[in-house]
């Protein structure tokens, strides 16, 4: 996790949790002049638009005061959704047995993209099975990971 992301997590997670929600994760995507700060929230029973609104108002107020991002950005607050992103070892462990798509920051064994069965975690590694081969991917090397929804 980058230091900017760690700073944003430390600043915003207490705000989200203080409102009674779980801070599922935070993404900061900087693309030239257009940057996006995404806060994913969750709670028992699911998230409503009003929940996102409440978190957005509080997060905006804190971000305006603390000003951790010097450039312009768009703030988005949403539920993790069906294809929920995975950020922590605990989240990977709790979704063992599901199909995932993982993108790494840099190639591992000649590839950056892995799609397969999430087997779980071992220490600081995420274990994913692609076809009949298991890969142990260091959590710090993962750029993006999402559950692949099953419509069985």
Swiss-Prot record:
It holds the Pfam family DUF150_C. GO terms for biological process: ribosomal small subunit assembly; translation. The keyword ATP-binding does not apply. The keyword Translocase does not apply. It is found in: Cytoplasm. InterPro entries: Ribosome_maturation_RimP, RimP_C, RimP_C_sf, RimP_N, RimP_N_sf. One of its GO terms (cellular component) is cytosol. CDD domains: YlxS_C. Keywords: Cytoplasm, Ribosome biogenesis. Belongs to the RimP family. Required for maturation of 30S ribosomal subunits. HAMAP family: RimP. This is Ribosome maturation factor RimP. It comes from Pseudomonas putida (strain GB-1).
């Amino acid at each position: 996790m980058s230091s900017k992301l760690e700073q944003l997590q430390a600043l915003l997670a207490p705000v989200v949790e203080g409102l009674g929600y779980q801070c599922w994760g935070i993404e900061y995507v900087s693309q030239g002049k257009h940057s996006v700060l995404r806060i994913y929230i969750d709670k028992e029973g699911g998230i409503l638009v009003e929940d996102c609104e409440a978190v957005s108002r509080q997060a905006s107020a804190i971000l305006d005061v603390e000003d951790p991002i010097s450039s312009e950005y768009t703030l988005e607050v949403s539920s993790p959704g069906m294809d929920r992103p995975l950020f922590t070892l605990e989240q990977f462990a709790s979704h063992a047995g599901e199909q995932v798509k993982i993108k790494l920051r840099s190639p591992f064994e000649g590839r950056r993209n892995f799609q397969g069965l999430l087997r779980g975690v071992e220490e600081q590694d995420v274990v994913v099975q692609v076809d009949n081969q298991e890969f142990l991917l260091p959590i710090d090397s993962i750029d993006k990971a999402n559950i692949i929804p099953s419509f069985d």
